C-alpha cells in the first residue's frame, strides 16, 4: 500500500501508509506474545487468512505490482510459523525456518517489506513477550522499525524520508506501545478476535474499487 501511494506522488497519504504496517505488526505481536504456546494454532489461522486475502490484494494492486507479489498477512503467517517451530524447539526447527524465510522473502519484498518486515515482527514479539525488555531488544526494535524505510532511503531525498517515512513510522507505533502496555496490564485482547483480518480485507477491497474507478476515468 505504501509503495503504491508513494509512486503516485502523494506524500501525506504515503506517510499514513507507513504507519499501517508497524501498527498491525504490534497488534499481532502483542497477541502472539501473550500465548506463544498456541503459536501453531495461530499460524494456521494466519495462513488461512493470508490465502483468503490474496485475491483482494491482487485486485487492489492490479497494474501496480506483479501477480506474484504477496500480501502483508503472509509476513505474519511466516512469523507465526517461525514462532511455532522455534519456541518449543521442534525437530529441525532452524532448517525449516531458514527454508521458509528463503521461500517468502523475495515475493514479500515487492509490496510487503520482505526481510525487514519479518525481522520487525519477530523482534516485536520478542519485545512484547518480556515484562521489562532489555536495552538491546529495544534498540533492535527501533533499528528494525527504521529499516522498514530502507527502500525509500535509496531513492528519495533524506528530508522527505525523515518527514514522510521515519517520523510517521515511529510516531504511531510508539503511541500504540503505550496502549498495548495498558491492555497487557488488564489481560484483555487489544482488539476483538479476527477484527484485523476483516479490516484488512475491507480496506483492500476499497483500494481496489478506487483504483478501478480511477483507471476507468483515466485519472
Which residues fall in each region the model found?
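Alpha-helical transmembrane segments and their immediate juxtamembrane cytosolic regions
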Residues: 1-219
Amino acid at each position: 500500500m505504501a509503495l503504491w501511494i508513494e509512486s503516485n506522488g502523494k506524500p501525506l497519504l504515503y506517510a499514513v501508509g507507513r504507519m499501517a504496517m508497524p501498527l498491525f505488526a504490534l497488534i499481532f505481536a502483542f497477541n502472539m506474545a501473550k500465548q506463544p504456546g498456541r503459536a501453531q494454532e495461530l499460524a494456521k489461522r494466519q495462513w488461512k487468512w493470508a490465502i483468503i486475502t490474496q485475491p483482494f490484494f491482487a485486485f487492489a494492486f492490479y497494474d501496480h505490482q506483479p501477480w506474484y507479489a504477496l500480501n502483508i498477512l503472509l509476513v505474519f503467517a511466516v512469523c507465526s510459523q517461525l514462532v511455532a517451530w522455534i519456541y518449543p524447539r521442534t525437530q529441525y526447527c532452524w532448517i525449516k525456518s531458514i527454508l521458509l524465510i528463503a521461500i517468502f522473502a523475495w515475493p514479500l519484498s515487492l509490496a510487503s517489506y520482505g526481510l525487514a518486515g519479518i525481522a520487525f515482527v519477530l523482534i516485536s514479539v520478542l519485545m512484547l513477550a518480556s515484562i521489562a525488555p532489555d536495552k538491546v531488544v529495544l534498540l533492535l526494535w527501533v533499528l528494525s522499525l527504521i529499516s522498514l524505510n530502507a527502500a525509500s532511503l535509496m531513492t528519495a531525498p533524506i528530508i522527505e524520508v525523515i518527514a514522510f517515512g521515519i517520523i510517521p513510522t515511529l510516531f504511531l507505533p510508539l503511541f500504540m506501545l503505550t496502549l498495548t502496555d495498558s491492555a497487557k496490564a488488564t489481560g484483555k485482547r487489544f482488539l476483538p478476535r479476527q477484527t484485523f483480518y476483516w479490516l484488512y480485507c475491507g480496506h483492500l477491497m476499497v483500494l481496489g474499487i478506487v483504483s478501478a474507478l480511477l483507471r476507468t476515468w483515466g485519472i
